[in-house]
Amino acid sequence: MDSNRLYGQCHCGAVQFSIPATLDLTAARRCDCSLCKRRGAVMLSCPRDDVRIESGEDMLVRYKWNTKIATHHFCSKCGIMTHHHRRTTPTICGINLGCIDSLDYRNYQTVPMNPGSDFTLVDENETQT
């Protein structure tokens, strides 16, 4: 293991990934868009090129909705969302902090909110896929 990286995984361990240990963990945010508010995850921004899927890439399923630009990645076995590629900034991933092994998630009880519900919708009645 590289001490310059933080390691994480889904609940069942089928999907494992790493991110740079130098990321500012105090920059974690919640989002209040229709998907994020339902999953309740605390997310951390990370340059997309710095996210490494260490194992289980074949176990990831992808979910896109509305504009079909943002891609949300879930383990096909346990259903945990590990990360997503953003619609507003495609070069940035949102990493689910709850998946990072070495972090005490209790330290993130009070986290600033990003106003995802303010994002423009193409069609509020669009069929979800």
Each model region followed by its residue ranges:
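A short Gly-Trp-Pro
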Residues: M1-Q9, A14-T129
